[in-house]
């Protein structure tokens, strides 16, 4: 086989016998390909192991024949736009290895995973609370209510919740996990759904309010955003109780 043919071979499923034969090949190009192949296989193995470890909390419920939903939020800190939450129920067949804390993933990776999560999950729902609600009841309570909204919108009722460091005001057993989106695939999937959903909302708002850069900053207080606030003032989606937006209402 040529080096090029071997390179193509190693991109697919390779048997131990084929690897053993390649190890006997004295060509330096072949040995370099094998070194690269082993590194990739090691990385893939470690990725699979980490993925399986993130089912630790889900398994506690699956073993009892119960469904558990992961719940997470995005958008607590921005000066503009809603807080968005997601509730996601997955089962033992869920196999999207790239699912992880949404903050660790590129926007492109999140966009690719979003439809796959919707397809593979048992049930997915989203909760949204806008700037007016946030200003009325504070961001923490708005966050909790949005989480409850997402859980109640699931078309299948879960037996319990895994939540990223929050308590959801619903009558269900809950496990609160600090940095839960890095410890549970259910919460990680919810973090991706919430993030992509909110980013799409902010892209839409960017078309309505083009001066603030919402499609780039998602409502966070970047220099571009603050400069636009100073020049144009706050919009309908700005949070009046968040500084420096609140300065415009004194």
Swiss-Prot record:
It catalyses: Endonucleolytic cleavage to 5'-phosphomonoester. Its EC number is 3.1.26.4. Residues 66-250 form the RNase H type-2 domain. Its cofactor is Mn(2+); Mg(2+). Its main location: cytoplasm. One of its GO terms (biological process) is DNA replication, removal of RNA primer. Manganese or magnesium. Binds 1 divalent metal ion per monomer in the absence of substrate. May bind a second metal ion after substrate binding. It is found in: Cytoplasm. Keywords: Cytoplasm, Endonuclease, Hydrolase, Manganese, Metal-binding, Nuclease. A divalent metal cation binds at residues 72-73, 164. The keyword Cytoplasm applies. GO terms for molecular function: manganese ion binding; RNA binding; RNA-DNA hybrid ribonuclease activity. It is an enzyme of class 3 (hydrolase). SUPFAM superfamilies: Ribonuclease H-like. GO terms for cellular component: cytoplasm; ribonuclease H2 complex. CDD domains: RNase_HII_bacteria_HII_like. InterPro entries: RNase_HII (IPR022898), RNase_HII/HIII (IPR001352), RNase_HII/HIII_dom (IPR024567), RNaseH-like_sf (IPR012337), RNaseH_sf (IPR036397). Belongs to the RNase HII family. Endonuclease that specifically degrades the RNA of RNA-DNA hybrids. NCBIfam families: PRK00015.1-1 (NF000594), PRK00015.1-3 (NF000595). This is Ribonuclease HII.
């Amino acid at each position: 086989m040529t080096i090029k043919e071997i390179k193509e071979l190693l991109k697919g499923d390779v048997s131990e016998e084929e690897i053993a034969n390649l190890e006997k090949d004295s060509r330096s190009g072949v040995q370099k390909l094998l070194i690269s192949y082993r590194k990739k296989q090691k990385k893939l193995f470690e990725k699979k192991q980490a993925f399986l470890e993130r089912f630790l909390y889900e398994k506690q419920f699956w073993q009892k024949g119960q469904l558990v939903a992961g719940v997470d939020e995005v958008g607590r800190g921005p000066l503009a736009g809603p807080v968005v939450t997601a509730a996601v129920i997955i089962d033992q067949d869920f196999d999207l290895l790239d699912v992880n804390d949404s903050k660790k993933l590129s926007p492109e990776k999140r966009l690719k995973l979003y439809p796959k999560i919707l397809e593979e999950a048992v049930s997915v729902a989203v909760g949204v609370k806008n700037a007016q609600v946030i200003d009325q009841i504070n961001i923490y309570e708005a966050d909790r209510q949005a989480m409850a909204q997402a859980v109640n919108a699931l078309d299948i009722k879960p037996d319990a919740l895994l939540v990223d460091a929050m308590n959801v005001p619903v009558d269900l057993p809950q496990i609160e996990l600090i940095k839960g989106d890095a410890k549970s695939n259910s919460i990680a999937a919810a973090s991706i759904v919430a993030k992509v959903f909110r980013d799409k909302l902010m892209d839409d708002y960017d078309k309505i309010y083009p001066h603030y850069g919402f499609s780039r900053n998602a409502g966070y207080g970047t220099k571009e955003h603050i400069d636009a606030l100073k020049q144009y003032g706050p919009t309908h989606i700005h949070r009046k109780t968040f500084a420096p937006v609140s300065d415009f209402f004194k």
